[in-house]
């Protein structure tokens, strides 16, 4: 793995619009801009890879820009995430779909403002709060400036409403609808091609390989924070709606528009 990438992932600078040329050279930007049916893709765990493959089956995509986003809460082997991009290259080259080199993006300060700073306030105000909702919102919002830079109107995400019958608060219908509506404000589509895939076995079928959920991906220090002690899912949907309507939408829009004006 490139030491320059490792340095970025160690320091996690504000990296949303001004990318180093070794990562995103002008020649690559030019090629991406002139490529029709280009998509910016989320690269994280198993579902994100399956989502890209399914998206290429459902849409006439000609090129993928894989993006790896950081917050400040991940831990584990980053190399695993980048290695999975080779799965895409291997699977998509036969269909003449280009997979560009990955772009790393992130802003822990933006994440903190959106997800961390007001934890106590939101818990008291709404009676429920989970960082996971804002975190996944951040993951989609933070890709908007890059997509705009590349004249790309499509972002692919790997969210699913059900995971073998289990719910994740950041992937319930209310959350996913909110993510998609936010990108629409910027003239973009957040495409969730596996949104209604419930079975993990179907995900493995799309991947054409065994890959258990949660394996071969980074961990998060806040994982499962919305679960009760015995493991049941606990959340207040009304609290999530208010979080978006009263805070997250406005905060994220102001932040993203500020980045776009730079």
What name fits each language-model region?
Residues 2-262:
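Nucleotide-activated chemistry modules centered on ATP-dependent adenylation/adenylyltransferase
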């Amino acid at each position: 793995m490139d030491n320059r990438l490792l340095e970025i992932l160690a320091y996690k600078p504000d990296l949303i619009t001004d990318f180093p040329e070794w990562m995103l050279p002008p020649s690559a930007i030019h090629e991406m801009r002139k490529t029709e049916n280009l998509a910016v893709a989320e690269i994280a765990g198993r579902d994100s890879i399956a989502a890209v493959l399914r998206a290429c089956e459902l849409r006439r995509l000609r090129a993928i820009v894989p993006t790896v986003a950081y917050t400040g809460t991940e831990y584990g082997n980053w190399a695993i995430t980048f290695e999975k991009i080779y799965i895409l290259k291997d699977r998509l080259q036969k269909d003449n779909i280009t997979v560009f080199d990955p772009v790393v993006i992130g802003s822990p300060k933006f994440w903190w403002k959106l997800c961390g700073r007001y934890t106590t306030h939101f818990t008291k105000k709404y009676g429920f709060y989970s960082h996971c909702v804002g975190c996944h919102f951040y993951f989609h919002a933070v890709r908007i400036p890059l997509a705009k830079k590349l004249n790309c109107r499509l972002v692919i995400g790997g969210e699913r409403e059900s995971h073998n019958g289990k719910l994740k608060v950041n992937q319930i219908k209310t959350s996913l609808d909110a993510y998609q509506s936010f990108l629409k404000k910027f003239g973009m589509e957040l495409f969730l091609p596996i949104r209604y895939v419930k079975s993990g076995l179907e995900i493995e079928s799309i991947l054409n390989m065994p890959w258990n959920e949660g394996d071969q991906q980074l961990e998060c220090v806040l994982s499962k924070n919305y679960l009760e002690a015995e493991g049941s899912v606990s959340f207040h949907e009304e609290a999530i709606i208010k979080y978006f309507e009263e805070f997250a939408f406005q905060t994220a829009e102001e932040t993203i528009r500020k980045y776009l004006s730079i």
